[in-house]
């Protein structure tokens, strides 16, 4: 009985972790993705709320290459209540090859989640629409702290069409 229970728990754990690195239904990662052009600083413009970003302003992400072929992810946000910056460092690896905007990302040991780029300004990589493993994760990232109205409108329209709850978007303040 103990072996059966242990086996079940192992299968359940693998299934749960596998689900954390999936793609939401209806979402397609961008193709012809260029990791080199994606590197550098990004500003978080809008998002759906999650505990790890709750109450933060001035949120940025920096992507750089790792020696093992992955990307280093450095997220920062300012916690005004505590008067301090919160920083999280992670790593990301391509899930469908280097030319698709779909990565597994980890900020904690062997546990990975999804990072799915479903729209991207392919001319100059000026903005990026990103989700996670399910539709409770949604971000609009930009190379600048503000985006033109047409980019924000495109983001909201596309996210709505894909089934994201854009009424719950939080717009990030940048100084």
PLM features: residue spans?
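Bacterial N-terminal signal peptides that target proteins for export
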Residues: 1-9
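A beta-rich soluble binding module of mature secreted/lumenal proteins
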Residues: 2, 19-175
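Bacterial Sec-type N-terminal signal peptides, specifically the leucine/valine-rich hydrophobic h-region
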Residues: 14-17
